Amino acid sequence: MAAAVAGAALLLGGLGACSAERTEDPEPTADAGSEETEAPAEEGGMIGIAMPTRSLERWNKDGANLEALLQEAGYETSLQYADNKVDQQITQLQNMINGGATVLVVASIDGTALGPVLADAASKDITVIAYDRLINETDAVDYYATFDNYQVGQEQGKFIEEQLGLADGAGPFNLEPFAGSPDDTNAKFFFSGAWDVLLPYVESGQLVTPSGKAPASNDDWASIGILGWGSDDAQAEMENRLNSFYSGDVKVDVVLSPNDSLALGIAQALEGAGYAPGDGYPVLTGQDADEANVKNMIAGKQSMTVWKDTRTLATQVATMVDEVLSGGEVTVNDEETYDNGVKVVPTFLLPPQVVVPDTIEEHLVGSGYFTAEQLGL
């Protein structure tokens, strides 16, 4: 079915724009549901797709894109969302295994919690592909497909470096750093990439953190992590820092946010504290090119986002599924980096893309990821 997968990928230019319109806050029962189509089992059986939640726009896109590609290629699929509940995701995976899945594609909620259920999958010769989040502490994960998450952080750090003129000795500037969910392996890579750029400037005094929440090393990243990547939690944390450490003439100059969900909450906290778009507005980073954040960029409330075109990730994973089921060699390009504590997982890495307000139309509209109408352009 390789040709079918390749052909189906051509449909995603339109699908990306359509899926962006899917609600971020659907009916509560939708997360637990599945979306299945029928195809002859002899063509490859059922492909189980386990996504973490519908509450973030990007996972809606990931699930829709991957499901569409696999169905167009003739595979039966079971797409399920777990409402960010680990036990629910485990139950969904077990049901997929019992239902005759031949491949499981898993975007895990907790990368350390799936060992037993995936061991059951391995005992039944079911191939497991970790989708964008590494599954840890088990040998029952066969492949991993993701974006270069360290590079994502590097791009955020370099953007801050360039915007503030740090390499030219400018400063001091007040920095407030955030990190992602401590149970998400990717969050470590995001932070390490950025902190490898920024920590030298913290140590030199060019970047100062009034809250004191500047990790001394990459290994301490989880101390500033926001569990579950929640916008509301990020907003509350930023409000606390602003209220506790910023008064009078003390202003925040830059906020390192690892993704758009956190950036959305941080921007709301900044607005509530009286920061308005313009010359005095802090540099604020992000990742994912979520629609609300792109609109914030247009409005001057966010400085950049690192775009991971999830259509390309879906295409790559669909290709890997097809290679597995056809008995061919599965395409990977990194067999050294992603050690899950038990094994180094063969990985395919995709490159991310920096988007700033001036390049929104070029990258996001020109590619069909959003329409101009969606963004109010």
Label the predicted regions.
Residues 1, 17-377:
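A residue-level marker of the well-folded mature domains of exported/periplasmic proteins
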Residues 1-16:
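Sec-dependent bacterial lipoprotein signal peptides
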